Amino acid sequence: MNLQRQAEIHRVTNETEVSVRLGLDGSGRCKVSSGIAFLDHMLHQLSSHGLLDLELVAKGDTHIDDHHTNEDVGIALGQALSKALGNRKGIYRFGQFTAPLDEALVQVILDCSGRPHINYELEIPTQKIGTYDTELVREFFVALANNSGLTLHIRQLNGSNSHHIVEACFKAFAKSLRMAIEADPRRGGSIPSSKGVLEQAGDNNTEKSK
């Protein structure tokens, strides 16, 4: 168990270099520089509403496009989340929140299960928000879920403004994650699984936890 619930990840590829420092029991302190302005804005939402202390620096081949950097930020953040959670002892495990932003309404339901899965149902009406390709929202969450071991369901209930839809999504995710990773005082430090174990992302065990 990671008693301090903190993690650092440094990921280097031929396309990107990403450094992440994540604290789960934080106050929402955020210092991020991904080279993608809109992604930075969304990471601030994640940190603020999830009460995560987040430091992130990314350098990538954004002269080509934002795809590699956006995805690798999701990968590194997911790895940091998995590492900080450790064996997931004593947490609530499940979280859900529905966040409004003006006309937009997005619901996120998640399970810190060790079983990576994403069901993504955002219908973003424009291809870009500023210079950010809106198809990259899905790629970010796929990378994060796969590398953190989250079961993640994202549903858009309403919305017509692209910025509002995506921001509501990040806020709902942040609040859901905060609920799921909080300590459950009734659990007394036990693992929230009937099997007594929750896999960490990257584990090779064939039998998954339920």
From Swiss-Prot:
Tell me any Pfam family this protein matches: IGPD
Q: Name one GO biological process term.
A: L-histidine biosynthetic process
GO MF term (any one) = imidazoleglycerol-phosphate dehydratase activity
Q: In which pathway does it act?
A: Amino-acid biosynthesis; L-histidine biosynthesis; L-histidine from 5-phospho-alpha-D-ribose 1-diphosphate: step 6/9
* Protein location: Cytoplasm
Question: An example Gene Ontology cellular component term from the record?
Answer: cytoplasm
Top-level taxon of the source organism: Bacteria
From the UniProt entry, list the residue stretches annotated as the region Disordered. 185-210
**Predominant location category:** cytoplasm
* Annotated keywords: Amino-acid biosynthesis, Cytoplasm, Histidine biosynthesis, Lyase
Coiled-coil parts of chain: none
Q: Which reaction does it catalyse?
A: D-erythro-1-(imidazol-4-yl)glycerol 3-phosphate = 3-(imidazol-4-yl)-2-oxopropyl phosphate + H2O
Q: What is its EC number?
A: 4.2.1.19
Q: PROSITE patterns attached here?
A: IGP_DEHYDRATASE_1, IGP_DEHYDRATASE_2
Q: Which family does it belong to?
A: Belongs to the imidazoleglycerol-phosphate dehydratase family.
- Please identify the protein, giving its name as recorded: Imidazoleglycerol-phosphate dehydratase
| Protein source organism | Prochlorococcus marinus (strain SARG / CCMP1375 / SS120)
Task: List the lineage, top down.
Answer: Bacteria, Bacillati, Cyanobacteriota, Cyanophyceae, Synechococcales
Encoding gene (name): hisB
